[in-house]
Amino acid sequence: KQSGYELYSDYFFDTVTIITKDKTDQIFNNALAQKVNIRKVNSEMLSVSFDEKKNVYRANQLLKIFNCAESIKENPTENLPNLPKNLLRTSTYLDHQVFNSYHSETEMLRYLKRLEEKDIALNRSMIALGSCTMKLNAVAEMIPITWREFSEPHPFAPIEQMEGFRTLFTDLKNWLRSITGFSGVSLQPNAGAQGEYAGLMVIRKYHLERGESNRNVCLIPSSAHGTNPASAQMVGMKVVVVNCDKQGNVDFEDLKKKVEAHSENLGALMVTYPSTHGVFEEKISDICELVHKHGGQVYMDGANLNALVGIAKPGNFGPDVCHINLHKTFCIPHGGGGPGMGPIACKRHLEIYLPSHPVIKDCGPATGIGPVSAAPWGSSSILSISWMYIKMMGSEGLKLATQIAILNANYVAHKLKNHFPILYKGTNGNVAHECIIDIRSIKNDTGVTEEDIAKRLIDFGFHAPTMSWPVPGTMTVSYTHLTLPTNC
C-alpha cells in the first residue's frame, strides 16, 4: 500500500490479491526470473500466498519483485487487522480435557499408543467392509507421497515446471483407458461422489449441446449407492427409481416401463456394475442398449470396478461414462474418510465435455464443463500411490488380484451358506466381489442383531463387516486380494 498498490480486499487469510493494472506482466515476469511463482489472476491483478515457512527474506524478495522501495526489518512487531471484527472468534477453544492433560513428549507418546491399541487396522486384521474395497496399501506404494517432489508443488504451478507430474498424469490416464476400454479420462474429480457429479454434468452438457435440454430424467435402481440420487439432484436431474428383482438385479420389465414412460425426457441411467447387491447384472448390455434406444446415456458407478479389472472393460459392454475410485480399486488408503480420487472415463463422443479449469487451461478441453474440483488434477499428490500399484502389478497381476477378490467372496459365501443365508446370488449360484449375509431370521429368533455380531467380531480382533447396508438387518462382506482363504 505504501508503494501505491491497492489490495483487492483488506480482509485475507493466507492469500493477498494486489491490483497491479498495467504493471501486471512486468511484475509477473520479474517473479519468474527470480524463480518465484505468483498467480496471475487476470491482466490487472496478481495474488500471493504465504505459509508458515515464509520468512522476512522471502517477504523482502517479493517487495523487490513488486518494485517497492520499502523493506521489512527482522522480527517486525506490527500486525495488520486482516480479519473483520464480526468474524473474530470470542469463544474459548481446545477446552476438552485431552488438550490439557499431557505436558511432556513421553505422556503424549503413551497416550497415542493407547489409542492405537484400541484400533483395528491392516497391521492387525483384515478389513472386510463390504463395498469399501480395502486393498493392500503396500509400503512401496506409499513411500513416494513422502517425497517433497510430490508433496510441495502447488496445484497452480506453471505446467512447464511440472514435467514429472505430467508424465505421471499421462501414464495413469493411458492405463485407465486400457483398463476401462474408454477413450477419454479426467483425473480432476476428488472422490467417487464427485466423479458421479462430473459424469452426470458431462451427460447434461451433451444433451444441452444437442438442443435437448428437456432430457433431465435420471433412472436409478433401488440398489444404488445413496450418492447416486444425490449427484443427480445436484446437476438438476429428476430421479426416477427402478425396482430390483428377488435376485438383486435391475428389474428389466420395470426398467422397460420407466424408460418408455420417460422416453422423451430420458437423460441418463445410473447403474452400478457389478451391483451393490454383489451380483453381476447379466443383462447389463441389454440395459444399456434399451436406454440408448430411448435417447439416454448410461452412467456406470465404478465403485465395484475391483471385480472387473483385467477381466471386463466397461467401455466394451455399454456404459458411456463411469467413475473410477482410485482409493478403492487402485489402493489409495481411505480409512477414516479420506483421501479419495474419483477420475471419470468416457466414450469418444463425450470427451469434449470432460472437466476443465480456468487457471490451468490444458488439464481439460476448452469445451468442457468447467471445474468440479479446486485443483486441476484433483488430489494429485496421492496419484503416485495408484501409479505405483499399477506399475508393480502389471496387467497379469491386476487380473490375478481381481480373480482372488472374487474367489475370496465366493469362498466366504460357500462356507457360511449352511449357517447364514446369502441374500443374493447369480444364476450360477455364485456372487461377485462381495456377499450379503442375511441376519434377519437370527434376529427374529434370538434377538441377536447384526450389531451384536459385529461387536463380537471386534472382541476377537476382526474388523466388522458393513452393517445394514445396502439391506437393513444384513452384513456385507468383501475380501479383496490381500486376504488368503485361510484367513477368511
Give names to the regions the model predicted.
Residues 1-2, 8, 315, 321-443:
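Active-site C-terminal subdomain of aminotransferase-like
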Residues 3-32, 50-54, 421-459, 474-475, ...:
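Conserved PLP-binding catalytic core of the aspartate aminotransferase-like
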Residues 17-18, 164-166, 194-360, 364-368, ...:
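Conserved PLP-enzyme active-site core in the AAT-like
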Residues 49, 91-96, 271, 388-391, ...:
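Short, hydrophobic beta-strand segments
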Residues 56-128, 132-140, 145-151, 488:
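Flexible inter-domain linker/hinge segments
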Residues 104, 149-190, 195:
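Conserved N-terminal alpha-helix of the aminotransferase class I/II PLP-enzyme fold
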Residues 121-140, 190-196, 334-339, 345, ...:
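Conserved phosphate/anionic-ligand binding catalytic regions in large, soluble enzymes, centered on
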Residues 480-486:
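Conserved small/polar residues in nucleotide/adenosyl-binding loops
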